[in-house]
Amino acid sequence: MSDPRHIAIIMDGNGRWAKARGLPRSAGHRAGVEALREIVRAAGDRGLGYLTLFAFSSENWTRPSGEVSDLLGLLKLFIRRDLAELHRNNVRVNIIGERAELAANIRALLNEAESLTHRNTGLNLVIAFNYGSRDEIVRAVRSLARDVAAGLLDPSSISAELVSANLDTAGIPDPDLIIRTSGEMRLSNFLLWQAAYSEFLFLPCHWPDFRPADLDAAYETFRQRERRFGGVEPRASADAEEEILCPSTKGAAV
C-alpha cells in the first residue's frame, strides 16, 4: 500500500506520563507540546499532506479549572511561539471545532494562525480545538435543515457528500490512518463521520514519548495493511504489526 496522505492523532496520555514520573499533570502537558512540535516537523519532512491533531475536546472543559487554564495557556504559547516557524516552513494551519463561545482572545489567535498561513502549500496542520464529532455533525445537520426550511434545498438531494461538505473538515480528505497513544482503544468523539474507512493504530506509549521513529513505524504498519473499503482482501496480521509499534520506547519504563 502507498503511504498515507492524511494521518490523525489522538494525543493521549500526558497525565499518566507525568504521574509515572511523580510530576504534576501540567508537566505532562508541557512535554506533550514538545512532542507535538517534533512530530509536526517530522510530518513535514516526510511529505505528509495532512496531519490532524486532537488538541482540546469539547468535553475537556469539565476538567479541573486549573488544568483547563494550563491547556489554554499552552495553546496560546504554542501559537505565539511557533506560528512564525510554521509559516516559514510552508505549513498551512486549519482549525476545526466550535469557536463561537470561545474567549475573544483565543478566537483571535486561532483566526490569526489560519489567516497568516492560508496561502501555504506544504503540510496542512489541522488542529481540533474545542472539537467534538457529535457536535460537528449536529451543526452540519442544522445547517442543512435551515436550507430545507428556507426552500433552498430539497431533502431528497441530501447525500453523504453534502453532509461532508457541511462539516468542519469540508475540503479536507478523510484520514487514512488514525493513531491513538496511551493504550486506550476508542475514538472519544473524534472524527466519527470521517473515520468510516480509516485504518486505526492504538499504541501503548504515552504521547510525550511519541517520537519520529514511532511515526515512521506507523507508516510501515500502514503499508502492511490492505484497505478493503468493504471488500474481501486480506490484511497484515496483528502479530506482524506488533513488532514495529513504539520502537522509541522498546525496553523503556512506562
Curated annotation (Swiss-Prot):
It comes from the Bacteria. Its cofactor is Mg(2+). It is an enzyme of class 2 (transferase). GO terms for biological process: polyprenol biosynthetic process. Mg(2+) binds at residues 12, 199. Pfam families: Prenyltransf. GO terms for cellular component: cytosol. GO terms for molecular function: ditrans,polycis-undecaprenyl-diphosphate synthase [(2E,6E)-farnesyl-diphosphate specific] activity; magnesium ion binding. Substrate binds at residues 13-17, 25, 29, 57-59, 61, 63, 180, 186-188. Binds 2 magnesium ions per subunit. Keywords: Magnesium, Metal-binding, Transferase. InterPro entries: UPP_synth-like (IPR001441), UPP_synth-like_CS (IPR018520), UPP_synth-like_sf (IPR036424). Catalyzes the condensation of isopentenyl diphosphate (IPP) with allylic pyrophosphates generating different type of terpenoids. Homodimer. NCBIfam families: PRK14830.1, PRK14834.1, uppS. Belongs to the UPP synthase family. This is Isoprenyl transferase. The gene is uppS.
